[in-house]
C-alpha cells in the first residue's frame, strides 16, 4: 500500500516535495490555506498579462530551478536578459551595475568609492563566511567600507529590507546575497531569467504532474493542527475535516509550525517559544501597467528616506516588450513589520502615497496613464537572520515523530528565493524516501 504523505503549504518547496514524492509512488496530498498555489511567486492576471504578485526572477547559477524547468519541459519558455541597476539617492538616479558606475558614484568621496569596490571584491572572493556570523552587517560595513559608504549605501538598503531589524541582521546574510549575484554573472554582466507567461508556467506544470501521478491539492484548506496519534498515524485537521497520514511535511513559517504542533505531548511551551524565536518581516508590493516608459533601468534601489518604498522595478526593461505585450509593467515594493501602517491601511491610500513617491523620483510620471494596478500584502515574506541565528535554525525532523519541517529559515546563510525553495523541496523529498524506503530517486541527479 502506498504511504500517505501530507504537505502543508503549496509554495515551491511544498510543490517540489509533492512532485518528487508523487513521482516516486507516494500518495500525496498538499494543503494550502490560500485559493492558489505558488506562495510568494503565485500569479495573477493584470491588464491581460500573467504576472507575479511580487517580483521574481532566476539567476544563471540557480541549478535546481533550471533543472526542474528542464525536467518539466518549460525551460523553453525561460530567457535570460541583461539586468540594469540604479541607485536613487538625494533626489538623483545613478547607474549602479558596474565597477565603473561605482567609480562615478559622486555621493561617495572618491577614496570611499575605491574602498567600497575593494570591500565588494573581497566579499566576492571570500569562501569562509563563518566569522561573519558574529557581527552585524551594518557594523561590519561601517568598519570595512567606512562610515560614509555605510550611511549612503548599506544602511538605507538594510533599513528598507528589514525595517526595525536593520541593525540586527548579521554579515553572513549580506555576504550570501553578494555571493549569489557574483556567481550569476557572466563576463558581460548580470543576467536574470524570466518565463514568457510568468512563473505560472512552472507552477502550473508542477500542479499538473502532481495530479497526473495521483496527488491532490486542497486549495483553500487552512490546517489548524498536526497531531501524532501514537502509532495510528499523523492527524491533520483543516476546517471541520480531519485526515490521517503516515507522515506530514510542513513548509510554513517556523512560528506558525510551532502553533500547529503544540498539542503533541513532545511539544512543551519552551519548544513552541524556541520555534517562535525566529522573527519575520512582511512585504507590501504594488504592480501596475502603464503606457509610459518611466526609466531606462530595470532595478532601482531607493537609498533616499524621502521616498516611501524600498525598490522600484521596470519588468519591461528587463524582459522586453515581446514578453509584456508592448505594455510597461512596474513593481513597487516595501518590507515592513506586521505592525506597520501599510498592513492596516486600505489599498488605495497606500498606492496613492507610492504614486506620489514615483512622481518625486520621476517628475514626468503621470499617474493618470496607469492602465491597471493591484496591491498585495504578505505577512511572512522574510525571516530575520540576526546574531545567534544558527542556534535558532529548526531541524528538518521535528520532535514529533513523523512530522517534518522545510522552509526558508533552514537555508542559512543563503537567502530566500525560488531556487532555494526548490532545493529544500528536493532535500526533503529524499529524506522522506529514505525514511520509508526509496522507490526511486526523482531529483534528476
Model-assigned labels for residue ranges:
Residues 315-317, 321-445:
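Conserved flavin/dinucleotide-binding core of flavoenzymes
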Residues 3-30:
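N-terminal Rossmann-like FAD-binding beta1-loop-alpha1 element of flavoenzymes
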Residues 108, 118-229:
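Active-site/ligand-binding neighborhood in enzyme catalytic cores
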Residues 24, 222-331, 335-343, 348, ...:
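Mid-domain catalytic core of redox enzymes
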Residues 13, 36, 255:
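Conserved Rossmann-like nucleotide-cofactor binding loop
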Residues 22-45:
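Glycine-rich FAD pyrophosphate-binding loop
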Residues 47-129, 156:
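Dinucleotide-binding Rossmann-like beta1-alpha1 core, especially the glycine-rich loop
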Residues 67-79, 85-95, 145, 149, ...:
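Feature captures the FAD/FMN-dependent oxidoreductase FAD-binding
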Amino acid at each position: 500500500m502506498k504511504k500517505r504523505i501530507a504537505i502543508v503549504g503549496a509554495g515551491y518547496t511544498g510543490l517540489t516535495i509533492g512532485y518528487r514524492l508523487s513521482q516516486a509512488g507516494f500518495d500525496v496530498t498538499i494543503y494550502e490555506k490560500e485559493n492558489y498555489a505558488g506562495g510568494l511567486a503565485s500569479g495573477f492576471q493584470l491588464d491581460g498579462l500573467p504576472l507575479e504578485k511580487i517580483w521574481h526572477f532566476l539567476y544563471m547559477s540557480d541549478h535546481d530551478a533550471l533543472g526542474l524547468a528542464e525536467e518539466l519541459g518549460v525551460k523553453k519558455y525561460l530567457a535570460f536578459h541583461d539586468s540594469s541597476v540604479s541607485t536613487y539617492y538625494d533626489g538623483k538616479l545613478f547607474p549602479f551595475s558596474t565597477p565603473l558606475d561605482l567609480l562615478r558614484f559622486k555621493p561617495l568621496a572618491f577614496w570611499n568609492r575605491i574602498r567600497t569596490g575593494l570591500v565588494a571584491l573581497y566579499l566576492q572572493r571570500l569562501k569562509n563566511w563563518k566569522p561573519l556570523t558574529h557581527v552585524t552587517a551594518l557594523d561590519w560595513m561601517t568598519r570595512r567600507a567606512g562610515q560614509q559608504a555605510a550611511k549612503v549605501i548599506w544602511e538605507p538598503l538594510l533599513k528598507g529590507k528589514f525595517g526595525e531589524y536593520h541593525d540586527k541582521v548579521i554579515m553572513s546574510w549580506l555576504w550570501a546575497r553578494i555571493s549569489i549575484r557574483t556567481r550569476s554573472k557572466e563576463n558581460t554582466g548580470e543576467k536574470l531569467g524570466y518565463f514568457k507567461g510568468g512563473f505560472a508556467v512552472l507552477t502550473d506544470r508542477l500542479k499538473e504532474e502532481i495530479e497526473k501521478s495521483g496527488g491532490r491539492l486542497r486549495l483553500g484548506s487552512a490546517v489548524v493542527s498536526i497531531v501524532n496519534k501514537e502509532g495510528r498515524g499523523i492527524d491533520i485537521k483543516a476546517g471541520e475535516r480531519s485526515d490521517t497520514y503516515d507522515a506530514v511535511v510542513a513548509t510554513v513559517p517556523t512560528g506558525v509550525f510551532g502553533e500547529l504542533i503544540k498539542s503533541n505531548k513532545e511539544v512543551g511551551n519552551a519548544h513552541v517559544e524556541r520555534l517562535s524565536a525566529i522573527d519575520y518581516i512582511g512585504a507590501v508590493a504594488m504592480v501596475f501597467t502603464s503606457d509610459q516608459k518611466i526609466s531606462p533601468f530595470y532595478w532601482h534601489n531607493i537609498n533616499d528616506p524621502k521616498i516611501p518604498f524600498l525598490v522600484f522595478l521596470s519588468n519591461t526593461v528587463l524582459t522586453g516588450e515581446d514578453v509584456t505585450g508592448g505594455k510597461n509593467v512596474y513593481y513597487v515594493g516595501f518590507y515592513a513589520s506586521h505592525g506597520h501602517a501599510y498592513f492596516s491601511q486600505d489599498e488605495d491610500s497606500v498606492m496613492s502615497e507610492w504614486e506620489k513617491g514615483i512622481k518625486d523620483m520621476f517628475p514626468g510620471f503621470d499617474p493618470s496613464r496607469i492602465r491597471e494596478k493591484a496591491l498585495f500584502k504578505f505577512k511572512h515574506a522574510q525571516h530575520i537572520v540576526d546574531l545567534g541565528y544558527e542556534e535558532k535554525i529548526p531541524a528538518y525532523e521535528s520532535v514529533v515523530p513523523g512530522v517534518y519541517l522545510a522552509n526558508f529559515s533552514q537555508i542559512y546563510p543563503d537567502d530566500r528565493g525560488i531556487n532555494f525553495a526548490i532545493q529544500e523541496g528536493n532535500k526533503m523529498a529524499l529524506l522522506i524516501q529514505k525514511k520509508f524506503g526509496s522507490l526511486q530517486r526523482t531529483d534528476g541527479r
